A protein has these predicted regions:
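Conserved donor-binding/catalytic core segment of Leloir-type glycosyltransferases
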Residues: 130-148, 154-159, 167
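Carbohydrate-associated surface elements
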Residues: 96, 117
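Short hydrophobic beta-strand element within catalytic cores of glycosyltransferases
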Residues: 225-228, 235
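Nucleotide-activated donor-binding/catalytic signature segment of Leloir-type glycosyltransferases, i.e.
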Residues: 171-194
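Aromatic "clamp/platform" in nucleotide-sugar-dependent glycosyltransferases that forms part
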Residues: 208
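Short alpha-helical donor nucleotide-sugar binding micro-motif in glycosyltransferases
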Residues: 84, 195-200
Length: 298
């Protein structure tokens, strides 16, 4: 299959683009070649297309839509929906993402839910960072926008960690909570993140209404126990031993995303939603290929 990627920057390490790098690495084992040719067998577009038409079937990888009531989410979604309506098939990153999109755009006739995957070859080649100062390392990593709830991550750590545990926060942070057991390391390369995850016992991701964060899949693949919110799609990929903080159900109505509610950590429980047990990119790539090939042949 000759596949042309659209709206993917293989030189960027943002969430969608880092996943694009993984597809580019692993899908050739399925018989896929990535070509910038005027006559591909199909296009795979991440999120939205800038083209009016395509000369081959279009597949959309959709990792989220806009619903923040503080912005004009209808305008923000306009081209995403246009791409959705053009697409022969749509790949959602989580059940949550599918239900959200169906609410705003309507059902799609051909879709698959394929959770994000981890580059196990790269992970297995990396040694964990040596940190002897603490009994247990906790970590978290994100682009720290308000709904990622860094301060809730920190509060959970301070309330549940042992006196000899340390928290390492990756990503740029402007409003830092100062504490002798909390360390801010800024933006890290993928390799350094994996090295940190491999040294961590716990990975905190208490983001509100997140779709299917790559950092959680990567941290799980590195051996971390995940602690996350029930709100959104993260719980689907957090693993069977994840700790879930229960939050109120959301009916998908527009909401102030950057004004998340405080969390009640007493509402924690085991993960009853975990549905993703094949998070290595070899399996994920095969799912992408099988969905696109089956749709083209159907």
């Amino acid at each position: 299959m000759k596949l042309s990627l659209e709206n993917v920057n293989l030189n960027s390490n943002s969430g969608p683009n880092s996943f694009g790098q993984k597809l580019f690495k692993y899908m050739p084992s399925c018989g896929v070649t990535f070509e910038n040719t005027p006559e591909p067998d199909a296009y795979l577009c991440f999120i939205e297309s800038g083209r009016a038409t395509h000369n081959a079937p279009l597949f959309q990888r959709l990792d989220g839509i806009y619903f923040n009531s503080s912005f004009d989410y209808t305008a923000q979604n306009s081209n995403i929906k246009r791409t959705y309506d053009m697409a022969k098939g749509v790949i959602f990153q989580s059940n949550f993402n599918k239900e959200l999109t169906f609410k705003y755009f309507g059902p799609h006739s051909k879709y698959a839910i394929i959770h994000n995957g981890a580059d196990l070859d790269l992970i297995n080649s990396i040694e964990k960072i040596k940190i002897d100062k603490y009994e247990n390392i906790w970590s978290c990593a994100s682009s720290w926008r308000p709904h990622k709830r860094l301060k809730e991550n920190i509060r959970y750590f301070l309330e549940h960690s042992g006196p000899n545990d340390g928290l390492i926060v990756a990503g740029n942070v402007e409003d830092k909570v100062k504490h002798e057991r909390i360390h801010y390391v800024g933006e890290l390369t993928t390799e350094k993140l994996f090295s940190l995850y491999k040294a961590s016992r716990f990975f905190l991701h208490l983001a509100w209404l997140d779709h299917c964060p790559n950092v959680v899949v990567d941290a799980l693949a590195c051996g971390c126990q995940i602690i996350c919110s029930s709100a959104g799609g993260t719980k689907e990929i957090a693993g069977e031993n994840a700790i879930i903080i229960q939050e109120d159900d959301w009916d998908f109505s527009p909401i102030e995303l950057y004004n998340p509610p405080p969390m009640d950590f007493a509402r924690k429980h085991e993960n009853i939603w975990n549905v993703n047990r094949e998070y290595d990119m070899t399996s994920v790539s095969k799912k992408y290929y099988n969905f696109m090939k089956g749709t083209l042949n159907g």
